[in-house]
Regions:
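Signature of the first transmembrane helix
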Residues: 2-11, 19-82, 122-123, 251-274
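Membrane-interface junctions at transmembrane-helix termini in multi-pass inner-membrane proteins
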Residues: 150-173, 310, 368-394
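Membrane-water interface segments that mark the loop-to-transmembrane alpha-helix transition
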Residues: 22-39, 67-70, 75-126, 140, ...
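N-terminal membrane topogenesis motif
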Residues: 1-41, 218, 232-256, 434-464
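Transmembrane helical elements of multi-pass membrane transporters/channels
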Residues: 26-46, 171, 175-178, 182, ...
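Hydrophobic alpha-helical transmembrane segments
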Residues: 139-146, 172-223, 414-438
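Helix-loop junctions and terminal segments of transmembrane helices
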Residues: 78-95, 164, 286, 290-314, ...
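Interfacial segments at transmembrane-helix termini and the short loops linking adjacent helices
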Residues: 55-58, 126-145, 277-280, 341-371
């Protein structure tokens, strides 16, 4: 049924897409379960590294949190490309069998050249990058950011291809394997004396491991269709789509995710410039705990995007869907914010240790700030589902202003967090001023059914 929906009954789509048939609900549930495990392992990594890294080891956990925030901002392109690649794969636009292999080989060669180039730039600019991120004592860790982003792009593309082939099992395993490898390798390298740099090195190493795994799984899919194509003869097929053209098609989701990533992560980097080493580590741990509702918003986004797309296609008002998604955030925020209000210190102390609890007083304010950001995230997803892009410039101006304002904010965690809250409130005001406008909707075609939500590109989820 999925093939019929995405192809709208057209002939000529390769039979290799039949891999998507079967229990799609079970596959989706398995992938969702893998995401849950991924997030649980990521949370465990945060707790392990917060306790393992001491403040006298190159800035301790505060430096690692800043480096991770830097990477998360860089990583958003990969998230958008993964979704776009999966869509193109389902529609058969990447080729099949040897044609698909040719496309992936060309893209991988381009990514290898790109990764080498940005790695050279990152090494040459390691001192300015370290200074900007606030990790002056970890210049080689700072130099890993751009190479890690290049590896992440390659991994995201490979995952997208596997998603397009319906191999959700491989995608799910790679999600869990990535976080598990990052935790194990990072912890070992940090424990043997490499400190913050060792802990951060686990990130690109985990990407390399999962790239090899995904490439092997993809090779099996290609080999499975090679026999059917062997008798066709002719020259080797060329790549079906260039990587540059592929990236251009995903520009709006990429821009939206960059804005969200900056609003979500730049405060930890700014904190490294405003606080002492010990306080920056404490703030980093507190900020990680405060962002729990962002994950709730991502889950609500899975519901919001297709439903908004469906209503848009049928000419209905999509705003009630946004209201329902916001209701999910509201319901979940009540117990979370109550815990932040009355048990902030015990919570941070239990999770990260007593040495990371100095900024626990700011947890409620930060919790409010990132609850607001969770709502902004849904508004941005809503606008992108409606194929609106004008708002991106206005929200981007807020994201640009945030680091400027935070670098001049209070040196006390609660005052600093209040500035974060004010910025998030402005961002939400801007996003919702665009989202709540009725605007034109696409009418249903006369005499025929409305276009399906599956015809409209889904919007990738943010991370972090």
């Amino acid at each position: 049924m999925l093939i019929k929906r995405v192809t709208r009954g057209r002939e000529g789509v390769s039979t290799s897409l039949a891999d998507l048939r079967g229990s799609e609900t079970a596959k989706a549930a398995g992938l969702a379960g893998a995401m849950i495990v991924n997030n649980v392992i990521a949370l465990g990594s945060t707790v392990v590294f917060a306790r393992l890294l001491k403040d006298n080891q190159g800035g301790g956990y505060g430096s690692l949190a800043a480096l991770v925030s830097y990477f998360l901002i860089l990583s958003v392109v990969g998230q958008a490309l993964q979704v776009a690649t999966a869509r193109e794969g389902v529609l058969g636009h990447l080729g099949t069998g040897a044609g698909l292999a040719a496309t992936v080989r060309q893209w991988s060669r381009s990514m290898a050249v790109f990764t080498v180039a940005i790695s050279i730039v990152s090494v040459l600019l390691r001192h300015p990058i370290a200074s900007a991120v606030g990790v002056k004592h970890n210049v080689w860790a700072a130099a890993l950011g751009l190479p890690a982003a290049g590896l992440w792009l390659e991994l995201s593309i490979l995952r997208g291809v596997l998603q397009g082939l319906g191999d959700y099992q491989a995608v799910g395993f790679s999600l869990m394997g990535e976080q598990g490898a990052r935790l194990v390798m990072g912890a070992i390298l940090a424990a043997v004396g490499l400190g913050v740099t060792g802990a951060y090195l686990g990130t690109p190493l985990s990407f390399i491991a999962m790239c090899l795994y995904c490439a092997r799984r993809l090779q099996r899919h290609v080999q499975a269709t090679a026999g059917a194509q062997a008798g066709q003869g002719g020259k080797a097929p060329a790549a079906a789509l260039s990587l540059v053209a592929h990236v251009k098609r995903a520009w709006a989701p990429i821009a939206g995710l960059i804005v969200i990533a900056v609003l979500q992560n730049i405060d930890i980097i700014a904190a490294k410039h405003r606080f002492s080493t010990s306080m920056a580590s404490s703030y980093g741990a507190t900020a990680v705990a405060a962002k729990v509702l962002i994950w709730v918003a991502m889950g609500a986004g899975f519901y919001l995007v297709p439903e908004v797309s469906r209503r848009r296609a049928s000419g209905e008002d999509p705003r009630p869907i946004l209201a329902r998604a916001l209701g999910i955030i509201a319901v979940c925020s009540v117990p979370v914010l109550l815990i932040f209000a009355f048990a902030s210190h015990p919570l941070i102390k239990a999770a990260f240790g007593a040495s990371k609890s100095h900024a626990s007083g700011s947890l409620l304010v930060l919790g409010l700030a990132f609850t607001v950001l969770a709502c902004t995230y849904l508004a941005i997803q809503y606008l992108l589902a409606l194929r609106r892009t004008l708002f991106l410039l206005a929200v981007a101006l807020v994201a640009i202003a945030e680091p400027i304002l935070l670098l001049n904010a209070s040196r006390k965690p609660t005052g600093f967090a209040a500035v974060v809250l004010a910025i998030q409130a402005v961002g939400a005001l801007v996003a919702f001023s665009f989202a709540l406008r009725r605007g034109p909707v696409a009418p249903a075609p006369p005499g025929g059914p409305a276009p399906r939500a599956s015809d409209i590109e889904p919007i990738p989820e943010a991370v972090g």
